[in-house]
Structures are given as structure tokens and as C-alpha cells.
């Protein structure tokens, strides 16, 4: 709840700054931040689409694009916060799709636990797509986005934020578009060096920890 309120404020400020319905691309592995945006939309904030942006551990992308929420083997990537196959916050969306039927949701989650799979029916999938789009990026695509943004804007993105940016590029929605940034690039020196051959310096306020 606290996370939803805090992130709801973030969404609210951004929409107020534009004055028009806005699309958000949200880097996510566990479906928490993007679900907060969904709650903000349900409460009346004029959000158009929420893009679920993830890496090659793409269970959320497969759920939204194909209607199959099915766990696969986790791959280690340069965006480790997304190295997840079962997104715990997705249960909240299932609960909402079940019209807040806790018993049905409990059965669905039990089925996921036992079989590693949840098939989303057409009606529920259409409801999801009214609010969400999705995209996944490979390792090479993520590195290319970091390079592209640096060359175009002289801004260094961390791998997670790069996935959010790349997911937006894949959909290229009209209107106001905002990519949520996540971590400081200095946390991912190997990825940054590989993408643009640059060392991302530690912020001065954090230098004391080393």
C-alpha cells in the first residue's frame, strides 16, 4: 500500500505536468511498480497505457502478449532485478481480474504453484490489454539502447532503465510518453563499459561508502 501511494504520487506529478493522458514505460520484474500505476489509473488518473518492460526473463511479456503465464528457467542477465520467473505482484492483478473473488484467486495461485502455469482466458486478456502493453529486450538490445541514448542525449542509462526505454521504442505510442528510471548506472559498471566503453563514476554523496 505504501509503495502504491508513493508511486501513485510519481505518476500523478508526471501526468499533471503534461496535462494530458500519458503513457508510462515501466521496467519491472515483479510487477510492483507498474501495478501501482494501474491502481493510480483506476483511481482516476488519466493514464493511457502502461508498458510492462522486461528482460529475457519475460514471463510478464508472455502473459500479456500470448495469454500464458508460465514459468521457465531463470537466466542471469545484466538487469538482475528482472531475473524473475514468478512475479509475486501479478497475483494482485489476477485478483482484480477475478472481480476480487479471493477463493478463485487462491485456486489460480495454487494451480500456478503446482503446475507452473496459468492460462489467461480471452475476456481477461482483453481487460489486461485495455491497460497494459508489454515488451522484452535481449541482452544485446539492452546494450544497444544504452549506446543509442548516450550517443543521442549524452545520458547514461542503467540496464533496467534502458529496457524501459527500449520497450517504449518498440511500441512508439503517440502522445505524452514517460519512461520510469530505476537505478544509478554506476551500479552496473561492466554493462556500461561494454555498451559505451565508459566508466560511470560514483556520485559524490556515495563516495564515502568505498
Residue ranges and their predicted role:
Residues 5, 26-30, 58, 79-86, ...:
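Hydrophobic alpha-helical scaffolding
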Residues 5, 32-35, 84-92, 137-144, ...:
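Conserved active-site and cofactor/substrate-binding residues in soluble primary-metabolism enzymes
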Residues 22, 26-103:
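A conserved active-site cap/scaffold subdomain adjacent to cofactor or substrate pockets
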